[in-house]
Amino acid sequence: MKYVYAFKEGNASMRNLLGGKGANLAEMTNLGLPIPQGFTVTTEACTEYYNCGKKISKEIEEEIFKAIGELEKIQGKKFGDNEDPLLVSVRSGARASMPGMMDTILNLGLNDEAVEGFAKKTNNPRFAYDSYRRFIQMYSDVVMEVNKSFFEKIIDELKEELGVHYDTELNVDDLKELVKRFKKIYSDHMNGEEFPQDAREQLMGAVKAVFRSWDNPRAIVYRRMNDIPGDWGTAVNVQAMVFGNMGDTSGTGVAFTRNPSTGEKGIYGESVSYTHLRAHETSLHLV
């Protein structure tokens, strides 16, 4: 049985296996649209995870790392490299849309050494350390279940110490201090264990966390309200990162091929630039 599909191997008809997001990413890839490349770990892998007592089999793990190897070739970067690391996002993707119910991790692949190489490669140390502190917070919350409120408190304390109001006013040295404090929160909650530095360990932890999120309280309530069977499971989409916080030419947004309110055909959406985010400090998720 095949548990992992590159986007180019799937299509829109494979929703039950690849989930809605994975099937649509595959379809867009095959249409030749400029989609950041990646792969999908199937809903059957999620079912197998639960059948095996919440463990990922060696077979599935090997397929995941084989897919990472193929993604490395496409991106021209190495996963776990400290000079020019391949960074990925890890997202859930059930066959039925469940917005906001399950978890996402961004910037996976960064560590204490890779962030320095990433800073040099991008010539943007502030961006690199901003990405790393976001990753530590997401990974700690989603994978290790360290509540994000601990990290938000640290951010507020640092801003108060510095006399600033917005996260975007923190400079690179401030963000390095934030990384140090975030890692201490992680260590304190993990009985002295340090934040994981191995990219492969990070990835497997994230995949397991997405599978687990299928059964988190929010997801269970949502499934009951929307008649979504509990045995469907969720797929996991691993995708090369695109950054919304890289600089003034970056941003974030959403687009639709129909009007979401009326169903009328046409391109609809909204976006916001990083310049605007810096000026107005919105809660929009940077991806």
For each feature predicted by the language model, list its residue ranges.
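Single conserved hydrophobic/aromatic residue that forms the stacking wall/gate
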Residues: 276, 281-287
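Nucleotide/phosphate-binding sheet-loop regions of phosphoryl- and nucleotidyl-transfer enzymes
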Residues: 1-278
